[in-house]
């Protein structure tokens, strides 16, 4: 599964607030009556939920040094984001999509690794930031993984790529700077699925007006927050660093004409009109990678993380494992452990970047044919066996496989916005953001504290 989670630790901590009550301060119970701001099919969205999401969006924009110039527009944009999330969750329930615990744990390991932390360190930091912070974080990550699976089922699985397209893609990649990454800003003005000529003209005119504001000194990020209907609008339109194979094909011609800091003309696509800004350009480090073939065995223990070191008996056991055959015999030695725990013990070939920090630390100085010193995880004690080390480059077969995956993802990205729009168009949505009927006025912090 493609990684979907932001790796900045501030974001990891700040998203916890989405899962906690907005009114955390003490106030008389009768003043805390909530109200409905939207109904999505048979699901309601409360004002407290919207307020929590708006606060999170403000924190993220503040971290990017993007001022909030229009709070009402921000709230409306955030509400639209929540509505899309609810629609996707409803579809997930209809399809019976689930996330297994081991999938979730692997994703959290990846997040910890990208923040140069172990899972234990990540857990401790989140719990220090908020009570039960790690558990709330786990559920948020589970939800984002569900969204990713839904996207794979509804969009990616239906995206077809021909062998000719793969061959042409590989040939084109040989002609372009495939080792270059681009940092892009993006603004989108969307079109209805069956847009009339008048609607197309109105959307194009709006995009032209936004572009004019940017070219006369308007800040691109602020324009994105205010006007963009793209998925990254609340991040100032920041698409991050992308390889040429990750950029929508309809951006290519415009991108080739841009210098750093320049903004494109309005670009037409099937989903609307776009403006991109080239905010950076850099070379990727291309090199032969070292891969490690690992096997893993987990000894279940509820208190492993509370102990500083494994027992001498356990260390001696690991030191005695000097062949893959002896390592595999652990399944017989510990037959009381459920088979499912170690069913996926062959981890295959992995690079250092693909491993969690604790895994690489355990095998970094290890010679092939030996087991690493046991270390503690959430599930218990882990013993890794290093079966081999190799230097690996992509073969032509691997390149075709990678090209196929890249093209499918590229096509899926181009059709994702259409699918989301259709999902929204088919739903019954009642927005009550401007409804003045609030049963009791929310007190200010000062009023609440005075009570």
Swiss-Prot record:
Q: Which UniProt keywords apply?
A: Chaperone, Isomerase, Periplasm, Repeat, Rotamase, Signal
Q: Which GO terms describe its cellular component?
A: outer membrane-bounded periplasmic space
Where located?
Periplasm
Origin, by domain of life?
Bacteria
GO annotation terms (biological process): Gram-negative-bacterium-type cell outer membrane assembly; protein folding; protein stabilization
The written remark on domains in the entry is:
The PPIase activity resides only in the second parvulin domain. The N-terminal region and the C-terminal tail are necessary and sufficient for the chaperone activity of SurA. The PPIase activity is dispensable for SurA to function as a chaperone. The N-terminal region and the C-terminal tail are also required for porin recognition.
Task: Provide the protein name.
Answer: Chaperone SurA
According to its UniProt entry, this protein's organism is Hydrogenovibrio crunogenus (strain DSM 25203 / XCL-2) (Thiomicrospira crunogena)
């Amino acid at each position: 599964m493609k990684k979907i989670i932001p790796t900045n630790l501030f974001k990891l901590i700040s998203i916890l607030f989405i899962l906690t009550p907005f009114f955390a301060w003490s106030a008389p119970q009768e003043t805390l009556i909530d109200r409905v701001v939207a109904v999505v099919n048979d699901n309601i969205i409360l004002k407290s939920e919207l307020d929590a999401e708006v606060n999170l969006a403000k924190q993220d924009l503040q971290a990017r040094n993007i001022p909030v110039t229009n709070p009402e527009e921000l709230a409306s944009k955030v509400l639209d984001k929540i509505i899309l999330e609810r629609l996707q969750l409803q579809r997930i329930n209809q399809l019976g999509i689930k996330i297994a615990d081991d999938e979730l744990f692997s994703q959290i390991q990846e997040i910890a690794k990208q923040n140069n932390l172990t899972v234990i360190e990540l857990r401790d930091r989140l719990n220090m930031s908020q009570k039960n912070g790690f558990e709330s974080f786990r559920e948020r990550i589970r939800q984002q993984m569900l969204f990713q699976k839904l996207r794979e089922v509804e969009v990616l699985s239906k995206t077809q790529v021909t062998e000719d397209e793969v061959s042409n893609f590989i040939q084109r990649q040989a002609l372009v700077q495939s080792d270059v990454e681009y940092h892009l800003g993006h603004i989108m003005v969307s079109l209805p699925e069956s847009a009339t000529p008048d609607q197309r003209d109105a959307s194009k005119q709006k995009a032209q007006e936004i572009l004019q504001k940017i070219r006369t000194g308007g800040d691109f990020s602020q324009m994105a927050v205010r006007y963009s209907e793209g998925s990254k609008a609340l991040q100032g339109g920041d698409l991050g660093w992308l390889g040429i194979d990750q950029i929508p094909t309809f951006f290519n011609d415009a991108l080739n004409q841009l210098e750093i800091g320049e903004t494109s003309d309005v670009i037409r696509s099937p989903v609307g009109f776009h403006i991109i800004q080239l905010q950076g350009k850099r070379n990727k480090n291309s090199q032969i990678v070292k891969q490690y073939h690992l096997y893993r065995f987990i000894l279940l223990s509820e208190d492993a993380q509370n102990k500083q070191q494994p027992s001498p008996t356990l260390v001696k056991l690991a030191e005695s494992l000097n062949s893959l055959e002896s390592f595999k015999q652990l399944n017989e030695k510990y037959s009381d452990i459920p088979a499912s725990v170690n069913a996926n013990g062959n981890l295959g070939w992995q690079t250092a970047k693909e491993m969690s920090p604790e895994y690489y630390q355990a095998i970094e100085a290890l010679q092939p044919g030996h087991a690493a010193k046991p270390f503690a995880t959430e599930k218990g004690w882990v013993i890794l066996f290093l079966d081999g080390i190799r230097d690996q480059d992509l073969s032509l077969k691997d390149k075709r496989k990678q090209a196929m995956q890249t093209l499918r993802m590229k096509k899926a990205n181009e059709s994702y916005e259409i699918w989301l729009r259709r999902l929204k168009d088919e739903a019954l949505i009642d927005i009550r953001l401007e409804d003045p009927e609030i049963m009791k006025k929310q007190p200010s912090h000062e009023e609440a504290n005075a009570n």
